[in-house]
Amino acid sequence: MFIGFDYGTANCSVAVMRDGKPHLLKMENDSTLLPSMLCAPTREAVSEWLYRHHDVPADDDETQALLRRAIRYNREEDIDVTAKSVQFGLSSLAQYIDDPEEVWFVKSPKSFLGASGLKPQQVALFEDLVCAMMLHIRQQAQAQLPEAITQAMIGRPINFQGLGGDEANTQAQGILERAAKRAGFKDVVFQYEPVAAGLDYEVTLQEEKRVLVVDIGGGTTDCSLLLMGPQWRSRLDREASLLGHSGCRIGGNDLDIALAFKNLMPLLGMGGETEKGIALPILPWWNAVAINDVPAQSDFYSSANGRLLNDLVRDAREPEKVALLQKVWRQRLSYRLVRSAEESKIALSSTAETRASLPFISDELATLISQQGLESALSQPLARILEQVQLALDNAQEKPDVIYLTGGSARSPLIKKALAEQLPGIPIAGGDDFGSVTAGLARWAEVVFR
């Protein structure tokens, strides 16, 4: 049996075909979405959990070495890895919020798969993280289906996050494919996420149209200009319908990070001065919220940065504010900070102003964020997104008849307004912002695996 599988930066979802239509399966708490989050007692617990409780093989030298190190470390630290030691989605977030200092938490593992300079042991770790999530998702799906799931059509961005170009894309897709097969899928095929989203929109068309699909996911923005219509639906070879692609490593997470940096970090002393009037360095505040950047987070939570923060508290004109950043460092609160920014961004989709409160840092710590504040904070990442739209059109040398906007950030009025200004007079259509890629993957799986 086949599934369409959107292993997303922000959320994961799975769909099957029933009576000719995609049907999304429940993943968590009666929702079809599983937030892309994972927690465990330690980083090493994940590898042992896969082996001990799910008989997932360590196929090569690096994964075997990682498993041996993990088992040894957990024994030395007297950590008992049980079947419930690894949690996913909102359950993992709840555990992290309850005890951030004692819970190892990861959001959006997909963000790191294309990172440059990963050592073999780091690649092996990310493969185990992805495998654990995919295994959990396959089990959730399997519990709702009578036949064994053996085939998966998995979405991938045009360009994964990372600076290595084709090499980064090869590395990231390789991690996904190996993880999927270790998680129990026998046949694994990939399709570009914007193409998949377009396939779901295509069933609504009565005639051929040039459709510009703009898919703003959690970690990437992908644009494809596609010929779509009834005559294309059942064709296995659609090469001639793909007019132009582009993709960048900017997505919803980057919007959240930018909003947190510009609007929340000043509450924690960013932009302040020392008693002598010297500006405080900005980098610690940026690294604190750059949750999709491995080196930045490693630097922020290093012992050396802890010493720097001590010095900044000592020298700052407003030491009580910088001490709040020190609390973020001490209690590992980066994810909660960015989550608060995300909640504010979502609220501003339907209101002119929202209050962002940070009681997990300090009881009364809060600020008002307006639409203008949001627009200012997001101007740089938004410009990058619009560049990709133009690049896809330049590659295609064609103009679209319609724009199909999808992805978690698609409901933002700010993005719709920017697209309308860039391409005036072209209608903007939308569908299931969180499910269109998954539905399209299920439709394409039916074509490929039938």
Language-model-detected regions and their locations in the chain:
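Phosphate/oxyanion-binding active-site loops and adjacent basic polyanion-contact surfaces
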Residues: 105, 125-134, 168, 191, ...
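Glycine-rich beta-strand-to-loop/alpha-helix junction loops that act as flexible
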Residues: 156-157, 402-410
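Phosphate/pyrophosphate-binding loops at sites that engage ATP/ADP/AMP, CoA/4′-phosphopantetheine
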Residues: 137-152, 385-402
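Early-domain small/polar-rich strand-loop-helix modules and first-structured segments
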Residues: 1-118, 251-281, 286-289
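Nucleotide/phosphate-binding catalytic cleft detector across ATP-hydrolyzing
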Residues: 1-22, 93-213, 230, 234, ...
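Conserved phosphate-binding/catalytic loops in two-lobed NTP-binding clefts
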Residues: 183-191, 416-442
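Phosphate-binding glycine-rich/basic clefts of nucleotide- and phosphate-handling proteins
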Residues: 35-40, 64-65, 228-360
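Extended, hydrophobic alpha-helical segments in both membrane/secreted and soluble proteins
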Residues: 176, 209-224, 405-408, 415, ...
